[in-house]
Design a protein with these regions (language model features):
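Hydrophobic lipid-interacting interfaces of membrane-associated proteins
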Residues: 62-66, 93-95, 110, 213, ...
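Buried hydrophobic packing residues in well-ordered domains
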Residues: 59, 88-89, 108, 141, ...
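Sec-dependent bacterial lipoprotein signal peptides
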Residues: 1-23
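An acidic-aromatic
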Residues: 85-139
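N-terminal leader/targeting segments and the immediate start of mature chains
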Residues: 23-73, 256, 266-276
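Edge/loop elements at the starts and ends of beta-strands within beta-rich repeat scaffolds
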Residues: 49-57, 69-72, 79-84, 186, ...
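Gly/Pro-enriched, hydrophobic low-complexity segments
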Residues: 157-259, 263-264
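One face of beta-strands
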Residues: 55-63, 74-80, 84-90, 99-101, ...
Length: 276
């Protein structure tokens, strides 16, 4: 069932990704070649101004998914709010949206109107990867799209170095490198995120390009995500970017349509309709 759904839904895959970088001058504040013990929170605060983290990011994204030797273009509207609130819907050329998605700390919901299918489950990477060609949780996806490294909330060791004209920061957990950041040495803009497995294998590479300013914040208008495990490439191009102060978290919760029985994604190896 999952393989059929992957083929059917891949054209609906929402772009995974927003950005809040202009604040990445973390690299310039550390002596080259030194090491520091710091928490994930400390690290993220080096990259983002605290008052912007609280705002909701809104944008239109044109996304091209390359997977299984095919290309799937899609246009979506999105709202993203840290730490884990996500709301996305497709923008069709004509007719009604093909995809609605919401995620928060507890729940992932996906509604496909054409199939009249509503999926409900935990916001886990296993559930998310049933539909989208990335082995990432919704929270990790949100961080990547906000230009924030998806670090675990544990003690990390950070080692910084210089790589050509770029500043490099490697993050270690239990002496194993889990993530590498590359930043422009001239302006501190985040250029690349490399996510690694515990054995050192590269799982995902994220590249950021075409920066512009939104409310005096440098934001990349283009994000490219390479997922080795899924053998996929996703290119996201943003427009109409803005920040707003959305206090109503209910806006990020997708209601179950009347008459539609939810398909629960956490029961066994494949989703089951509620009550079956």
């Amino acid at each position: 069932m999952a393989s059929v759904r992957n083929n059917r839904l891949i054209k609906f895959i929402p772009g995974i990704f927003f950005l809040l970088f202009g604040c990445a001058p973390v690299a310039t504040s550390l002596p080259k070649g030194t090491e520091y013990d710091l928490s994930a929170r400390d690290t993220l605060e080096k990259f983002i101004k605290a008052h912007h983290i609280k705002d909701t990011f809104k944008a239109v994204a044109r996304i091209e998914i390359n997977a299984d030797g095919k290309k799937y273009p899609i246009k979506v509207a999105m709202m993203l709010k840290r730490p884990s609130f996500m709301r996305i819907e497709s923008i069709p050329v004509i007719g009604l949206p093909d995809l609605f998605l919401s995620a928060n700390n507890d729940t992932l919901k996906i509604f496909l109107p054409k199939e009249n299918e509503f999926y409900l489950g935990r916001p886990s990477r296993e559930n998310f990867s049933l539909f989208f060609p990335v082995n990432l949780s919704p929270a990790d996806v949100l961080s990547i799209m906000m230009g924030i490294p998806p670090l675990p909330d544990v003690k990390l060791r950070w080692k910084e170095s210089v790589e050509g004209e770029k500043l490099r920061a490697d993050f270690f957990s239990d002496d194993k490198k889990i993530l590498t950041l590359l930043m422009d040495g001239n302006n501190g803009r985040l250029k690349e995120i490399v996510i690694l497995a515990s054995d050192g294998e590269i799982l995902h590479t994220v590249n950021y390009d075409d920066y512009c300013q939104v409310e005096n914040i440098d934001l990349p208008q283009k994000i490219t995500i390479l997922s080795k495990g899924k053998n996929s490439t996703i290119v996201v191009r943003y427009s109409d970017m803005e920040f707003s102060k959305e206090e109503n978290e209910a806006l990020f919760d997708l209601p179950i349509p009347v008459g539609v029985r939810p398909i629960i994604m956490d029961r066994g190896s494949s989703p089951h309709r509620q009550g079956s």
